[in-house]
Curated annotation (Swiss-Prot):
Involved in transcription antitermination. Required for transcription of ribosomal RNA (rRNA) genes. Binds specifically to the boxA antiterminator sequence of the ribosomal RNA (rrn) operons. One of its GO terms (molecular function) is RNA binding. HAMAP family: NusB (MF_00073). Belongs to the NusB family. GO terms for biological process: DNA-templated transcription termination; transcription antitermination. CDD domains: Terminator_NusB. InterPro entries: NusB-like_sf, NusB_fam, NusB_RsmB_TIM44. One of its GO terms (cellular component) is cytosol. Gene3D superfamilies: NusB-like (1.10.940.10). This is Transcription antitermination protein NusB. Keywords: RNA-binding, Transcription, Transcription antitermination, Transcription regulation.
């Protein structure tokens, strides 16, 4: 599975966890069915293990928004992206930013992709 697809599947799993209060294992199983992808699982597990710290990074960059007011797709995608930016050294920040914007265009809307871009641009230095 390509990393873009792994990110999309991770977003879907994180969304299920957030919306349905589903367990991490059940969400991964629902999304992946009989497939397995180590990167997708690393993303979901990493976001959930570091959720409080990730949210603490996101919240001050929301510019007059509260994290609990964000729609669940945007919140899940922001968490996923911040995890990649802050915890994974092998993913350049520019790649994570671009992937997030493109995925937002698919699963959310143009306004959300611009919002996500703005939040992540405040969080991620482009030189990593």
């Amino acid at each position: 599975m390509k990393r873009r697809e792994a990110r999309e599947k991770a977003l879907q799993a994180l969304f299920q966890i957030e919306l349905n209060e589903m367990s991490l294992d059940q969400a991964i199983k629902n999304i992946m069915e009989d497939e397995q992808d180590d990167y997708m699982e690393q993303l979901v597990e990493g976001v959930m293990a570091n959720k409080a710290e990730i949210d603490a990074i996101i919240e001050p960059n929301l510019d007059n928004w509260r994290i609990d007011r964000l729609n669940k797709v945007d919140l899940s995608l922001l968490r996923l992206s911040v995890y990649e930016i802050k915890y994974l050294d092998d993913v350049p920040n520019r790649v994570s930013l671009n992937e997030s914007i493109e995925i937002a265009k698919i699963y959310s809307d143009e306004k959300s992709s611009k919002f996500i871009n703005g939040v992540l641009a405040n969080i991620a230095p482009e030189d990593k």
